Each structure stands twice: as C-alpha cells, then as structure tokens.
Amino acid sequence: MQTEQLLHQLFEKKALNQQQTEFLFTAIVRGQLDNSQLSAALIALKLRGETPEEISGAVTALQADAESFPIPDYPFADIVGTGGDGANTINISTASAIVAASYGLKVAKHGNRSVSSQTGASDLLTALGVNVHISAHKARQALDEIGLCFLFAPQYHLGFQHAIPVRQALKTRTIFNILGPLINPAKPKRQLLGVYSSDLIQPYAETVARLGHEHSVVVHGSGLDEIALHGVTEVAEIKAGQIERYTLTPQDFGFQPQPLETLRGGKPSENAQILTALLQGKGKLAHQQAVAMNSAMLMSLFGYPNLKQNAQAIMDIIATGKPFETLQQLTQY
C-alpha cells in the first residue's frame, strides 16, 4: 500500500523525502514493482528532476541491498563518471585510477560495461586481461597490496537486474544513470565524480554532502564526464559538508588546451592498445595530459592541493612506465 501512495505522490509532481525514496527503491531492487509501475516512477522522477534527497534515498537503498565489501580503515578513493556524455573518448578515469595507484594512492574503482560509448571500464579491463569478476575478498587484497582494485557493479548490485527491461524499453536516461558512481560497494568517502551534464553538478554535490563524504569533487568538462583537456571544467568541491563551486582550465594544470578529437576512443581492443601505450609511457601527449589532469585532481583529495605540481608528478610517473607494471600486477588477481 505504501508503495502505491509513493507512486501517487510522484504522479502529483511532489518530491519524496529521503526516507520515502529509500523505501521505494528498496521495493524496486527486491523486484516488488511490476514493469509498468517502475516505468511510471522513473519517468515521473525524470520529468520533475530528481532532488538530492531522492538521489540520497535511492543510494542508501541500493547500498543496503548490495553484496558486502570489506571496507578498509585507510584512506582510499574512487574516480568514476556517469557515462552517457556521448563523446566516445578513451577511458580516462580507468587510466587515471591505474596511474594514481602507481603514484601510491589507494583507488577502489567502481565500474560497469559500456552505457553509451563503445567501451566501458569493465570492457576495457577485460580486454587488458584483468578478471573483473574476482571476489570481494580478492579485490580487497589487491587494494591492500597494489593500491588498486576494480569492483564490477553487476556483481555487487544484483537488484539492478529488476530494472533492466524497463531501462532498455525507455531508451532514455533515468535516475539509474546517475546512481552508478555513488553506489561503490566499498563506500569511499573521497571521490572524483564526473557527470554528463552541468545541470547535474549541484544536485550531485548536494547528494554527496548528504551522504557524508569527507572530500569529493563533482566535475563536468565542456561536454565530458571528466576534467577537460579541450576546454573549461565546472567543479563543485565538497569538503566537510560545504560545497565550493569554481572552474578550471588546462592551464591550471600547466597544460595547453588540445582538441577533443585527440581523445577519441574506439572498440575495447582499440582502447586497450591506446591504454597500454599510455601506461608504458609511449602514448600520445594529449592522452597523457588528460589522464594527468584527472589524476592530479584525485591527488588533491589526499591532501596534495597543488594541481600543477600534481600533474607534473603524474607525467613523470607515466614516463617511467610504472603504471603498466601496476596493470600487470592487477591481472594476477
């Protein structure tokens, strides 16, 4: 009965509070809504625009339903985007996670198969010989030992399967597209979060603040769900519940802008070749710089605030080829 009341509230264009949304999404991941109810709920949320309270409630429900991951007591982060920006670039956040781990940061990367591009994080890692289906225990071991693990979303969020038919039928973005980066089963309190639209920056930032992150950043880079090498990046930085908005350019990292065309990716096999060259220090300069900018911002969440110094440190470590060794180590788990 309560589910029907909540659906009625949505149809009246009234927002749900966090607790109500948590109840509704718990019902969704348990398969308690039929496809027509679920479809109607997702469309009602989309047309009105999801509030931070609603996004937070959905995240809480999905995290409670997720398979557990042994959360470490040391600082670690995630770098992840919503996808869906339609730009079909190389996998910048996946490369940045590997490079940042090579620098000595701890990164629990949450990811999935491709949404709208040709190559999602798991597609790429599989092409590189990484087993994305390892157990939570094994993944934690990798995080402890080499500073990097990959958590494959469908393995932890089994309840998502109930929404797949409706999402495929709707063929449009729904709240599920924006939940992915926020439901890492390791529950990192430091995240570099990329969003596909600048309209999402503020609600995302407010959601992150509600969820109690220690230090996270939400970015949208001139059409990309990453920090942009080709233009201006809009930023919301969340620290201790406070949100600060500002913009960044490539010059803030010590680089000159490069055309977006230089970052175009392709199929998993093509992106794997591009990433291998990059991690070996043999990649295109634009690829290295794009990864350095995103890794530099990730470093700032660990107490390294100087973005130019960070970017240079990352360029130096890429030149050594050490990130490729980190990738090789990851394939052993």
From Swiss-Prot:
InterPro entries: Anthranilate_Pribosyl_Tfrase, Glycosyl_Trfase_fam3, Glycosyl_Trfase_fam3_N_dom, Glycosyl_Trfase_fam3_N_dom_sf, Nuc_phospho_transferase. Pfam families: Glycos_trans_3N, Glycos_transf_3. Its EC number is 2.4.2.18. Pathway: Amino-acid biosynthesis; L-tryptophan biosynthesis; L-tryptophan from chorismate: step 2/5. The keyword GTP-binding does not apply. Anthranilate 1 binds at residues 81, 112. Its cofactor is Mg(2+). Anthranilate 2 binds at residue 167. 5-phospho-alpha-D-ribose 1-diphosphate binds at residues 81, 84-85, 89, 91-94, 109-117, 121. Mg(2+) 2 binds at residues 225-226. It catalyses: N-(5-phospho-beta-D-ribosyl)anthranilate + diphosphate = 5-phospho-alpha-D-ribose 1-diphosphate + anthranilate. GO terms for molecular function: anthranilate phosphoribosyltransferase activity; magnesium ion binding. GO terms for biological process: L-tryptophan biosynthetic process. One of its GO terms (cellular component) is cytosol. It comes from the Bacteria. Disulfide bonds: none annotated. Homodimer. Belongs to the anthranilate phosphoribosyltransferase family. This is Anthranilate phosphoribosyltransferase. It comes from Pasteurella multocida (strain Pm70). The gene is trpD.
